[in-house]
Amino acid sequence: MKSITTLLPLALAIASTQAYCPPTGPVLPPPTLPACPSNLTSTTRRALEKISSSTDATFSVQVTSRNHTFFSHHHTGTTLADIGTAEVDGESVYRLASVTKVFTVLSLLLQEGVDLDLPASHYVAELDNVPGYESTTLRMLASQLAGVPRDGYMFDLTSGLSPEMLKSLGLPSIEPPANVPKCDAVSQGQAPCTRSEFFDVLAGAGTTWQPGQKAAYSNLAFIILGFAVENITGTPYVEVVRDTILEPLGMTSTGYSAPELSRLVVPNNSRDFAVMDVYNYNATGGLYSTPNDLSSFLRGLLNFDLLNNARTSAWLKPQAFTSSPLNSVGAPWEIYRPTSLLPDNRPLDVYTKSGGLPGYNAYIALVPEFDIGISVNVAGAGDKDYDVVRAIFSSVLETLVPGLDALARTQAAQKYAGTYTSGSGNTTSSLVMSVDDGPGLKVEKWTLLGNNVLDIVAMLNRAQGAAAIDVRAYPIGEDERWLLVTEKVGGDQGAPAVYAGTCDGWFLLDQVRFAGLPTDEIDFVVKDGEVVGAVSPGLRQQLTKS
């Protein structure tokens, strides 16, 4: 008994003040999806058909796994112009608007030797002459933390509204300062700013927040990032994106110029904007693409075709909080953590980027829990565009996630659940694993040389026996290695207010090793795709599945 108690102190320590505190990310291996899982997607299709019947907008939705697009839905509304495509499908071209920002950041990440935490002026020398930007970094720009004004003169009221309209709104009749270049409002027929003019505008615009302080959405920040890409590579920004992202991923219908009209989705109220070159705004919102190409892009991210696993994972991490614990800001991800989609009410990490231009809305999303990517393109939704694209995206998640979660549980139960044993009599060791409504694999029973390991874990954590604790295994994501986390059944109801609802399991992982090996790890042995055994490295157990 003594040897076991020295192996396990705190290695499986109680880690939560709520019911479940699994590590973030997938709690079971993502499910393997068939090519056409109609039983999984039928509810999603019905939900989108209901939206189709209530909107005049045109939209396309695709959902892809790492291997293939397993769901597509296209609806041709009544607000398309008589030019452009007459019926949308996977090869129809939409404007992506600010979804472009993901491509801009990725094009920077793909450059060797770029330090995102150096002052941005190291890569864009003009910033030396812009007050307030001395400490601004590329990472701040990419994460909406630089305090850069949102839009400059492009959407200034004086550029888009007549003097009569401004007067009717009660605004004074004034002209912008003489030193503010009237450029880049291309939708109003103005010429694009030169680089010199752009930085003149920036120098006179001040900042929204102090750099590094708080998130504030900015399109101008990504124009600066586009300039940085050009300076770093010595190549025009649009060519860098083409050479480093579009061509490697086979995105042949994606680019910064309007395609032939027969493929372009053209809303009736946005005919001019459909084909408009946005010049400096290319790096913030200039891309055109198809649903099929977006699925190729999302598969490229899921398969780490451009960035490896470690760098992709780091890229997805939050960079700034919002005032809600359910969403945060990345580079440039808009990260949501809904708690209502999974049966155990734990947060589901959803990494999104939205976009909107007159007549167009777009969404892309990665859901690592299930290894899927989602794209939504909307055209011609009018004043309700924001509501429509969010309703579509939310409907896809709400209807797909329960089925994906159930499939992941079913497949995990078939593969891992069961009894693992070795020895006999007093030397018997065993491990019983199951899949229930909670996260991960539940450890139902665990013995070592006839001793109840779970009783020992409970004793070390001042719990009243094995029934008072819950031990679960979670996948590390490689080589069938899993980590164990122990929690009190029902959570810690007596936690002080500051710690109520928090999760501290990350403090305790791999805390105790025995003779160099972890005591909180279980490795499954797989042969010909079937699990045939389990190994506890720290306890030196080698068990065979019954």
Annotate each language-model stretch with its function:
Residues 37-41, 54, 93-101, 113, ...:
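Solvent-exposed, acidic/flexible segments
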Residues 40-47, 70, 99-100, 116-123, ...:
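Stable alpha-helical elements in mature extracytoplasmic
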Residues 90, 95-99, 111-166, 204, ...:
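Active-site helix/loop module of the DD-peptidase/beta-lactamase fold
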